[in-house]
Amino acid sequence: MSQADLPEPAPAFQLKGSMLAITVLELAHNDIERLDEQLAAKVEQAPDFFNNTPLVLALDKLPEASREIDIQALVALCRKHRLRTLALRASDAAHLEAAAALDLPVLPPSGARERKVDPSSKTPAKPAEPTYRPTRVVSTPIRGGQQVYAQGGDLVVLAPVSPGAELLADGNIHVYGPLRGRALAGIKGDTTARIFCRQLAAEMVSIAGQYKVAEDLRRDPLWAEAVQVSLSGDVLNITRL
């Protein structure tokens, strides 16, 4: 048998595109001691959220005078609070050098991927037609550690959502039972998305990146009630169903 007659081996891997919800820790000040204290407080509020959570460290918003920061100590501090640093978001040369030394990937600064539009263009590009996907319906309980994502549409869960579970949707999220895990609606920036549930007992709710954690939610008079969550500006509103 010649080499050409040999069957091709089955592929050992596939490269697939994926949209993952990654937490971004955006530093506003170069104060590791204060960061340690405030992260500890956040962990106490939502311990299940800080459980080997993947993280992007964003250093691009630091003031110019505060950019000399010990990145190795910063990554160690995040690990101490069970946050796993996947990458840095930075442009400062010293930050890029430190990232290379730690073998951390670097993402471009916020807004760096935006393209300038030439106003003199005579023929504007035709916008892409939106892709509509059917609502994703889940009828079984969502256990702790599970993640369910409805890409391009709404997510409907007809069963309880346990602590440690995570619901993600580009559109709305409906839970016809107790919501005890995390629910993130409008994760691609849809500010009109909403979250509906029969019983609000969530670790976190988020719409288009604006969120409230369990400690904030427990202080709401509608805690443990049937509610809807909507976004007005940068404020999450919780109202009775």
From Swiss-Prot:
Signal sequence, start to end: none
GO biological process: cell morphogenesis; division septum assembly; regulation of cell division; regulation of cell septum assembly
Residue ranges of coiled coil: none
SUPFAM superfamilies, alphabetized: Cell-division inhibitor MinC, C-terminal domain
UniProt-annotated stretches for the region Disordered: 109-135
Keywords from the UniProt entry: Cell cycle, Cell division, Septation
Subunit structure: Interacts with MinD and FtsZ.
Function noted in UniProt: Cell division inhibitor that blocks the formation of polar Z ring septums. Rapidly oscillates between the poles of the cell to destabilize FtsZ filaments that have formed before they mature into polar Z rings. Prevents FtsZ polymerization.
Family of this protein: Belongs to the MinC family.
PANTHER family given in the database record: SEPTUM SITE-DETERMINING PROTEIN MINC
Protein name: Probable septum site-determining protein MinC
Organism for this UniProt entry: Stutzerimonas stutzeri (strain A1501) (Pseudomonas stutzeri)
Underlying gene: minC
